[in-house]
């Protein structure tokens, strides 16, 4: 007897022989484990990997274990979107939209036959050498689940409880042996996780505090990012580099902070990180003149000709849920493009047309008041209306300056503006004194 018939009284903490327990559950599990197919073992393995990789039960493609997934592009401090798939490339669905990468966990027991095309966007994880302990946990887990599926009442609960015990043991083994038990293949090169991570501080890359422990998922993400770094650089060579980590979870907040800063709100560290990465800052000043992204927008608008607008679909391309600005070179997502457009509105270079309104430099508050989704669905951009030269001439004449300076100012020359500012500055003390004299009678 293996202890199956021993029970503990909850009130006295005493053990006793329980003759009502007429089923030896452990023996049933052992017996079923001997008859398990490789496919059943693979399913059990994937259950453990799913828990360790923190995958949700919400599958976009029923029947396929595939999830949208993010990996950090470590050199640029930004997450890239891709897919995590349990299985081989020839088994995954082809309907999903293209992303930047695929991470595959290959079946360890019923190994699939497929040709690795050494593609730059594919990373393969294989369990190399499960020992007897792991095989025992795995088979016990699969057997207990199998028995639970046909049992009922108390027996079902016992089998499910034993399955969870085995799953915990299996997960613990995978966590502890991960670095040597897994091989990672990228573009035909196969190494253990340990070898891939040589010379790299995984804890530092995972940004862990001194008390935090690196987990299974962190290691997979960091090593995948190391392998895919060149791939990310190849498909978006001039993508921005951020000073804070931009994730799918925080990017809406970061971009919102940047837009609020452009609208006159507090310029937070996050806002500066976004504006600076998009080259919209010259020191503390917002100035898109040196931003390659802003200048690309302006050159496209200029190419349309005088008085023409630049439509949204002339700036963003791709399917409705995956759009990019200049996908070959910059590969900017719509929220980052909107920030660039906001910088150009701020500088007076652009008017942003959205549903029911046009945002120019006099309506910057709209960048904060409108939702990011609304701004991302902008209609078009256009050049601001030309300055009224007659009014500008009158202004220069009012301050005893040559009216011809108005023409130069309207063409972007800064010298007339400086002269006008000097005249205004000289007049301010006189105006203040006059106001004070009037108050004193």
Which role does the model predict for each range below?
Residues 1-441:
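Extended alpha-helical scaffold and adjacent linker segments that couple domains
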């Amino acid at each position: 007897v293996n202890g199956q018939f021993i029970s503990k009284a909850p009130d006295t903490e005493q053990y006793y022989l329980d003759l009502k327990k007429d089923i030896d559950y452990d023996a049933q599990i052992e017996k079923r484990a001997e008859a398990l197919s490789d496919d059943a073992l693979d399913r059990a393995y994937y259950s453990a990997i799913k828990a360790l990789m923190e995958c949700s039960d919400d599958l976009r493609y029923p029947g396929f274990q595939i999830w949208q997934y993010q990996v950090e592009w470590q050199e640029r401090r930004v997450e890239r979107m891709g897919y995590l798939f349990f299985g081989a490339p020839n088994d995954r669905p082809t309907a999903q939209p293209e992303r930047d990468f695929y991470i595959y966990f290959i079946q360890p027991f019923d190994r699939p036959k497929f040709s690795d095309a050494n593609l730059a966007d594919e990373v393969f994880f294989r369990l190399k050498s499960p020992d007897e302990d792991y095989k025992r946990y795995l088979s016990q887990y699969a057997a207990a689940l199998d028995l639970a599926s046909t049992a009922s009442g108390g027996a079902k609960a016992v089998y499910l409880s034993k399955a969870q015990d085995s799953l915990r043991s299996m997960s613990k083994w995978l966590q502890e042996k991960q670095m040597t038990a897994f091989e990672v293949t990228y573009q035909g090169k196969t190494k253990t996780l340990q070898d891939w991570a040589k010379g790299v501080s995984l804890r530092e890359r995972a940004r862990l505090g001194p008390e935090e422990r690196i987990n299974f998922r962190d290691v997979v993400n960091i090593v995948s990012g190391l392998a895919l770094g060149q791939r990310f650089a190849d498909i978006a060579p001039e993508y921005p580099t951020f000073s804070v980590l931009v994730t799918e979870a925080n990017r809406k907040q970061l971009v919102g902070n940047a837009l609020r800063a452009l609208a006159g709100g507090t310029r937070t560290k996050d806002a500066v990180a976004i504006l600076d990465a998009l080259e919209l800052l010259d020191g503390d000043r917002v100035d898109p003149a040196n931003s390659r992204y802003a200048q690309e927008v302006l050159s496209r608008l200029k190419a349309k000709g005088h008085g023409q607008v630049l439509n949204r679909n002339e700036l963003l391309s791709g399917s409705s849920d995956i759009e990019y600005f200049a996908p070959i070179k910059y590969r900017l997502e719509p929220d980052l493009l909107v920030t660039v457009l906001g910088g150009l509105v701020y500088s007076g270079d652009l008017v942003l047309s959205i549903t029911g309104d046009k945002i120019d430099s006099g309506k910057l508050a709209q960048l904060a008041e409108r939702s990011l989704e609304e701004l991302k669905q902008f209609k078009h951009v256009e050049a601001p209306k030309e300055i009224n030269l007659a009014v500008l001439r009158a202004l220069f004449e009012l301050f005893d300056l040559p009216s011809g300076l108005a023409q130069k100012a309207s063409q972007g020359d800064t010298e007339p503006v400086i002269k006008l500012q000097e005249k205004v500055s000289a007049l301010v003390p006189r105006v203040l004194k006059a106001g004070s004299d009037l108050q004193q009678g």
